[in-house]
Amino acid sequence: MIDSPRVCVQVQSVYIESQSTPDDERFVFAYTVTIRNLGRMPVQLLGRYWLITNGNGREIEVQGEGVVGEQPHIAPGEEFQYTSGAVIETPMGTMQGHYEMVDVDGNAFRVAVPVFRLAVPTFIH
């Protein structure tokens, strides 16, 4: 497996108050991921891995094929964007992980997704 600095990942998260029920320890977040291919060759996203940690340190691992039902091909200079969600039991938590990808020659590589916060805007820790 090769390491590729040619794919860039950015994530924005937002608290979904209308779907959350804090009294039931249910905090819903949406996150939008933008994956940019900065390289010269097309790439394809095959799978994902997430480590979701709530404010109490409880961890959940999620892995699977593709994202939002797709295994997108991303041409050089192009980007793929999708929105998904996470539900945790505390008003603050984190997510991190990686994407399993392959280039046009069939070389597999991972793209890390650095830690990002899931936080209710009014919550101060």
UniProtKB/Swiss-Prot annotation:
* Parts forming coiled coils: none
Extract the signal peptide range. none
Note the SUPFAM superfamilies from the entry. Answer: ApaG-like
GO BP terms: namely:
error-free translesion synthesis
Q: Where is the ApaG domain?
A: 1-125
Q: Which HAMAP family match?
A: ApaG (MF_00791)
What name has this protein been given in UniProt? Protein ApaG
Q: Which organism is it from?
A: Enterobacter sp. (strain 638)
* Organism placement in taxonomy: Bacteria, Pseudomonadati, Pseudomonadota, Gammaproteobacteria, Enterobacterales
